[in-house]
Amino acid sequence: MALCQVRFFSQSLGKASEMVVVLPDSGEGPFPVLYLLHGLSDDASIWLRRSRIEWYVRDLPLMVVMPDGGRGWYTNAVNGDACEDHIMKDVMGQTERLFPAARDRQHRAIAGLSMGGYGAMSLALHHPESFVAAASLSGAVAVGHKPITDEMPPDFKRIFGENPQGSDKDLFALIKKVDRSQLPKLWLDCGVDDFLIEDNRAFHAHLESLGIPHVYHEFPGAHTWDYWDEHIQQVLQFVMEAMG
């Protein structure tokens, strides 16, 4: 297994960025790819530092790409960085240029925790032609479904606008617009003691009301790395089964 740290210039952000890539030990590729997103205030290295993701994929024919998403929520800000374009154009472009990565939908998936859970769902719903599966662990899935208040961090208004409900940043609205035949396979999980549990329950209920197939789990636990380290293993199984 190889571990690569890649520094590159992101045309979408207009600045340097980085990603960490885990490559399988054997085979020549092209390899299926999981794009794995971090949470708010973390970076490209956090999954390696706080979980055993490298160990969990040791026997899988799977590349794992962990990009730096900053605090940008993996969306193109109303007034600011084009973080969606950064992932879809720069990160994916560099991955496919530098590594033997699969380039077809059937062998690409995306997942993330917290902010990254929102990002995984948002990117998969904006680009269903690019991902066969998307998974959210403890995702902030309702962040675009509510008014942005003064109690929230100041960059939220810059990213989402003052009232993003109903916009393309609202997952509840966005999923209604996606062609059902093009929807990726969806996974949502959250700890029962997580402060985001009610948002996840609401999104799950919304998907059920629309008749949209998805996997939903509530597990013991909170918004912690112990929780994510345990349940990323199930997400990996879900992703591999979706890829076939």
State the predicted function of each range:
Residues 1-244:
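Non-catalytic cap/lid and distal C-terminal segments of serine-dependent acyl enzymes
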